[in-house]
Regions:
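Conserved core segment of the aminotransferase class I/II
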Residues: 122-164
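Conserved coil-to-alpha-helix start sites within the AMP-binding
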Residues: 1-4, 24-28
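A short helix-loop-beta submotif of the ANL/AMP-binding
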Residues: 34-40
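Short hydrophobic alpha-helical segments of the AMP-binding
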Residues: 11, 31-32, 93
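Active-site phosphate-binding strand-loop segment of PLP-dependent enzymes
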Residues: 40, 44-112
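A short helix->loop->beta-strand "cap" motif at the edges of active sites that frequently abuts
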Residues: 16, 37, 95-99, 125-127
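Phosphate-binding glycine-rich loop
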Residues: 1-17
Length: 164
C-alpha cells in the first residue's frame, strides 16, 4: 500500500484525474483523494464472471487523466487482464501520455487458467509505467510487508526521498 501512496504522491497534483478500475481496496481511493485529485472509477461488470468493458476504460482516460490504476489479478473479485488487453491499455496510455500504475501483488495467485501476465513484459524503457509488487502475498510473508516499485530509472531518487 505504501508503494501505491508514494506513486500517487509523485504523479498526482491537485485537480488531476486518476482513473481507477474498481472495485479496489478503499486505501487506493484515499491515496488519490489525499493528493486532491479527482477519481474517475470504471467498475468491473459481473454476469457469471467479472469482466472489464475495455471501451469504457479507454473512454474514461481523458486529457485530464494523469494516472490509470489497475489491480490485476483483482482483489476482491479475482478478475484478471489478459496480455492482449494489457497491450491495448498500455498503447492507449502511451497515446494519452499518462501514467499507468499496475498493482500486480496477486500475480502469482491464480487458481484457474493461465498465469497472470505483467505489464512489464510488454513495456518499453521510456513508458510511464509503475508496477507495484510484494512478497507479502506471493510468498506468504504478509507480516513482513516487503514490497517494491518497478519504475523508470529517473524516478529512483525521488522515490527514495519519499520513503525516507
Amino acid at each position: 500500500m505504501l508503494g501505491i501512496k508514494i506513486c500517487c504522491e509523485i504523479i498526482l497534483e491537485k485537480g488531476d484525474e486518476g482513473v481507477i478500475v474498481g472495485p479496489v481496496w478503499p486505501n487506493i481511493r484515499s491515496s488519490v483523494v489525499l493528493r486532491e485529485a479527482v477519481i474517475n472509477e470504471v467498475s468491473l461488470e459481473f454476469d457469471k464472471t467479472w469482466t472489464l468493458d475495455l471501451n469504457k476504460l479507454l473512454n474514461a482516460i481523458t486529457d485530464k487523466t494523469k494516472l490509470v490504476f489497475i489491480n490485476s489479478p483483482n482483489n476482491p473479485t479475482g478478475w484478471m487482464l489478459n496480455s492482449s488487453e494489457q497491450q491495448i491499455i498500455l498503447d492507449h496510455v502511451r497515446k494519452k501520455n499518462c501514467w499507468l500504475l499496475a498493482d500486480e501483488v496477486y500475480h502469482r495467485i491464480v487458481y484457474q487458467g493461465n498465469a497472470s501476465s505483467s505489464f512489464l513484459s510488454l513495456s518499453e524503457p521510456d513508458d510511464k509505467l509503475l508496477v507495484i509488487n510484494s512478497s507479502s502475498k506471493s510468498f506468504n510473508m504478509t507480516g513482513w510487508r516487503v514490497g517494491w516499485i518497478t519504475h523508470p530509472e529517473y524516478l529512483g531518487e525521488h522515490i527514495a526521498k519519499l520513503v525516507q
